[in-house]
A protein has these predicted regions:
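N-terminal accessory targeting/assembly segments
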Residues: 1-103
Length: 103
């Protein structure tokens, strides 16, 4: 009998804000992603007072996120922040991921 390896779609979780511990709110989001059938492969945070109009995150963090998504072969990026339609579209185009969503 042969068992095939099941590879779950990879996801990167992102949180932006001014809170001291930006990873804590991502614990619940991580559980939700796992329940939905995703494997959380990375978590990124950014302390930022005002969101960038184009990407929500700054351009330096955008480059880091793209690098992490590529290195971990993650197809999905989930933000724990509310993004505009323009920001979502810009992120998908810049990151070359299957989808970018916010929770």
């Amino acid at each position: 009998m042969r068992f095939e390896e099941i590879v779950l779609p990879g996801v990167v979780l992102v949180n932006v804000g001014l809170e001291k511990d930006l990873e804590k709110p991502l614990e619940e989001l991580s559980l939700l992603a796992k329940t939905a059938g995703y494997e959380v492969r990375a978590i990124l945070t950014q302390h930022k007072e005002h969101p960038d109009k184009a990407y929500y995150i700054g351009t330096g963090k955008l480059l880091e996120l793209k690098s992490v998504a590529e290195a971990t072969e993650s197809e999905v990026v989930i933000f724990d922040n509310e993004l505009s339609g323009t920001q979502l579209n810009n992120l998908v185009q810049a990151l070359l991921v299957a989808s970018c969503v916010y929770a």
